[in-house]
Amino acid sequence: ADGMSFAVFDGMGGAAYGEVASEIAVQKLRKYEKKLKYADGTRMLDQLVSSFTTEANDAICDMLAEKHCTTGGTTFSMLYFLRDSIKLYYLGDSRIYRYKSDGLTRLTRDHTVANQKVDAAIYTEEEAKKSPDQHRLTLFIGSDHKKLGLNADSRPLVPLEMGSKFLLCT
Protein backbone atom coordinates (compact mmCIF):
# COMPACT_ATOMS: atom_id res chain seq x y z
CA ALA A 1 0.00 0.00 0.00
CA ASP A 2 3.06 2.26 0.17
CA GLY A 3 2.47 5.41 -1.88
CA MET A 4 -1.29 4.93 -2.14
CA SER A 5 -3.56 7.82 -1.27
CA PHE A 6 -7.29 8.26 -0.85
CA ALA A 7 -9.06 11.61 -0.73
CA VAL A 8 -12.54 13.04 -0.31
CA PHE A 9 -13.78 16.50 -1.28
CA ASP A 10 -17.11 18.11 -0.41
CA GLY A 11 -17.98 21.18 -2.45
CA MET A 12 -19.81 24.03 -0.80
CA GLY A 13 -21.36 27.24 -2.02
CA GLY A 14 -24.46 28.28 -3.84
CA ALA A 15 -25.39 28.14 -7.53
CA ALA A 16 -23.64 24.75 -7.95
CA TYR A 17 -20.20 26.34 -7.56
CA GLY A 18 -19.43 23.90 -4.75
CA GLU A 19 -19.63 21.07 -7.24
CA VAL A 20 -17.33 22.95 -9.61
CA ALA A 21 -14.92 23.73 -6.75
CA SER A 22 -14.64 20.09 -5.72
CA GLU A 23 -14.10 19.04 -9.35
CA ILE A 24 -11.31 21.62 -9.71
CA ALA A 25 -9.66 20.23 -6.57
CA VAL A 26 -9.93 16.65 -7.84
CA GLN A 27 -8.33 17.64 -11.16
CA LYS A 28 -5.49 19.46 -9.37
CA LEU A 29 -4.85 16.45 -7.12
CA ARG A 30 -4.69 14.18 -10.17
CA LYS A 31 -1.82 16.34 -11.46
CA TYR A 32 0.12 15.40 -8.32
CA GLU A 33 -0.79 11.70 -8.36
CA LYS A 34 2.51 10.38 -9.74
CA LYS A 35 4.66 12.66 -7.57
CA LEU A 36 2.68 11.66 -4.46
CA LYS A 37 3.05 7.98 -5.28
CA TYR A 38 6.84 8.27 -5.18
CA ALA A 39 7.23 10.71 -2.29
CA ASP A 40 10.21 9.52 -0.26
CA GLY A 41 9.24 10.82 3.15
CA THR A 42 7.02 13.17 5.09
CA ARG A 43 8.94 16.34 4.20
CA MET A 44 8.48 15.77 0.46
CA LEU A 45 4.88 14.69 1.03
CA ASP A 46 4.13 17.83 3.06
CA GLN A 47 5.61 20.00 0.29
CA LEU A 48 3.58 18.26 -2.42
CA VAL A 49 0.32 18.53 -0.47
CA SER A 50 1.03 22.20 0.26
CA SER A 51 1.65 22.85 -3.44
CA PHE A 52 -1.56 21.02 -4.32
CA THR A 53 -3.75 22.87 -1.78
CA THR A 54 -2.30 26.24 -2.81
CA GLU A 55 -2.77 25.53 -6.53
CA ALA A 56 -6.32 24.22 -6.02
CA ASN A 57 -7.20 27.15 -3.76
CA ASP A 58 -5.97 29.71 -6.28
CA ALA A 59 -7.84 28.03 -9.16
CA ILE A 60 -11.07 27.90 -7.13
CA CYS A 61 -10.72 31.55 -6.09
CA ASP A 62 -10.17 32.51 -9.74
CA MET A 63 -13.27 30.56 -10.80
CA LEU A 64 -15.38 32.19 -8.07
CA ALA A 65 -14.12 35.67 -9.04
CA GLU A 66 -15.05 35.02 -12.69
CA LYS A 67 -18.55 34.02 -11.55
CA HIS A 68 -18.79 37.10 -9.28
CA CYS A 69 -19.35 34.76 -6.34
CA THR A 70 -17.93 35.68 -2.94
CA THR A 71 -18.23 32.30 -1.23
CA GLY A 72 -17.53 28.74 -2.19
CA GLY A 73 -14.92 26.08 -2.02
CA THR A 74 -14.44 22.50 -0.98
CA THR A 75 -13.41 20.58 2.09
CA PHE A 76 -10.57 18.08 1.74
CA SER A 77 -9.34 15.00 3.58
CA MET A 78 -6.62 12.64 2.45
CA LEU A 79 -4.95 9.47 3.72
CA TYR A 80 -1.47 8.62 2.41
CA PHE A 81 0.15 5.25 3.08
CA LEU A 82 3.85 5.53 3.87
CA ARG A 83 5.58 2.26 4.75
CA ASP A 84 3.91 0.99 7.94
CA SER A 85 2.11 4.26 8.73
CA ILE A 86 -0.41 6.68 7.31
CA LYS A 87 -0.25 10.44 7.03
CA LEU A 88 -3.44 12.51 7.23
CA TYR A 89 -4.17 15.87 5.62
CA TYR A 90 -7.38 17.84 5.90
CA LEU A 91 -9.13 21.20 5.54
CA GLY A 92 -12.69 21.90 6.67
CA ASP A 93 -14.97 19.33 8.24
CA SER A 94 -14.54 16.22 6.10
CA ARG A 95 -13.44 13.83 8.81
CA ILE A 96 -11.12 10.84 8.98
CA TYR A 97 -11.80 8.04 11.45
CA ARG A 98 -9.94 4.86 12.36
CA TYR A 99 -11.86 1.75 13.32
CA LYS A 100 -10.14 -1.07 15.15
CA SER A 101 -11.15 -3.67 17.72
CA ASP A 102 -11.50 -1.15 20.55
CA GLY A 103 -13.84 1.12 18.57
CA LEU A 104 -14.02 4.15 16.32
CA THR A 105 -11.62 7.09 16.82
CA ARG A 106 -11.81 10.45 15.07
CA LEU A 107 -8.36 11.44 13.79
CA THR A 108 -9.13 14.96 12.53
CA ARG A 109 -10.49 18.14 14.08
CA ASP A 110 -13.02 20.27 12.20
CA HIS A 111 -11.90 23.74 11.10
CA THR A 112 -14.92 25.63 12.45
CA VAL A 113 -15.73 28.83 14.30
CA ALA A 114 -17.04 26.68 17.17
CA ASN A 115 -13.66 24.96 17.60
CA GLN A 116 -11.87 28.32 17.48
CA LYS A 117 -14.15 29.48 20.30
CA VAL A 118 -13.37 26.32 22.29
CA ASP A 119 -9.65 27.04 21.83
CA ALA A 120 -10.21 30.61 23.05
CA ALA A 121 -12.20 29.33 26.07
CA ILE A 122 -15.35 31.11 24.85
CA TYR A 123 -17.25 27.83 24.44
CA THR A 124 -17.04 24.54 26.26
CA GLU A 125 -16.95 21.39 24.12
CA GLU A 126 -20.64 20.85 24.93
CA GLU A 127 -21.61 24.40 23.96
CA ALA A 128 -19.70 24.05 20.70
CA LYS A 129 -21.65 20.90 19.76
CA LYS A 130 -24.95 22.81 20.07
CA SER A 131 -23.79 26.05 18.45
CA PRO A 132 -24.61 27.07 14.88
CA ASP A 133 -20.89 27.96 14.73
CA GLN A 134 -20.12 24.23 14.44
CA HIS A 135 -21.13 24.47 10.78
CA ARG A 136 -19.22 27.69 9.96
CA LEU A 137 -15.92 26.65 8.40
CA THR A 138 -12.76 28.66 8.94
CA LEU A 139 -10.48 26.76 6.54
CA PHE A 140 -11.20 24.98 3.26
CA ILE A 141 -9.83 24.95 -0.27
CA GLY A 142 -11.04 28.29 -1.61
CA SER A 143 -10.84 30.16 1.71
CA ASP A 144 -7.50 31.87 0.96
CA HIS A 145 -8.82 34.71 -1.24
CA LYS A 146 -5.55 36.65 -0.88
CA LYS A 147 -3.66 33.66 -2.31
CA LEU A 148 -1.00 33.68 0.39
CA GLY A 149 -0.61 29.89 0.28
CA LEU A 150 -2.97 27.39 1.87
CA ASN A 151 -1.54 24.53 3.91
CA ALA A 152 -3.65 21.57 4.90
CA ASP A 153 -3.65 20.57 8.52
CA SER A 154 -1.94 17.26 9.20
CA ARG A 155 -1.22 14.84 11.99
CA PRO A 156 1.96 12.98 12.90
CA LEU A 157 2.29 9.58 11.26
CA VAL A 158 -0.35 7.14 12.48
CA PRO A 159 0.99 3.57 12.80
CA LEU A 160 -0.86 0.97 10.75
CA GLU A 161 -2.17 -1.84 12.89
CA MET A 162 -3.48 -5.19 11.71
CA GLY A 163 -7.25 -5.02 11.29
CA SER A 164 -7.50 -1.21 11.29
CA LYS A 165 -9.95 0.35 8.88
CA PHE A 166 -10.12 4.00 7.89
CA LEU A 167 -13.20 6.02 7.04
CA LEU A 168 -13.06 9.30 5.11
CA CYS A 169 -16.40 11.04 5.27
CA THR A 170 -18.21 14.27 4.77
Give the role of each language-model region.
Residues 1-170:
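PP2C/PPM-type serine/threonine phosphatase catalytic domain
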